[in-house]
């Protein structure tokens, strides 16, 4: 349970964003839906001010990806600005079902490859 008294008396430090990596999209959507609903309900009792800008958003998910090259190497791409936000990254490093192609062959992502994608973002 959230301590609502503490939340109602405090001012947010920075807006938040969520980066849900491959294999965590469903969890990211669930967390996002909860945060959107919770913060909208909390903002009903607040007055709007500069400190509260970005507190209640339609979505906290960011557009990010880790595209793979033909060699199996990848790069992290964030398609929007995250300057000045608190970024939370969701990654399931034990998800073996995510695949990518290397030299025409299907390869399953190992925990190390998931961790490398986490570091790239």
Task: Tell me what each language-model feature is.
Residues 1-121:
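PRPP-associated nucleotide enzymes
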């Amino acid at each position: 349970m959230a301590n609502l008294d503490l939340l109602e008396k405090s001012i947010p430090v920075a807006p938040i964003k969520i980066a849900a990596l491959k294999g965590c999209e469903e969890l990211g959507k669930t967390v996002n839906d909860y945060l959107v609903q919770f913060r909208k309900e909390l903002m009903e009792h607040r007055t709007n001010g500069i400190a509260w800008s970005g507190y209640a958003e339609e979505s906290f998910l960011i557009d990010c990806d880790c595209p793979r090259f033909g060699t199996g190497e990848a790069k992290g791409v964030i398609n929007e600005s995250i300057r000045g936000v608190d970024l939370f990254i969701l990654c399931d490093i034990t998800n073996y079902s995510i695949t990518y192609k290397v030299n025409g062959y299907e390869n399953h992502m190992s925990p190390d490859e998931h961790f490398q994608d986490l570091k790239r973002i």
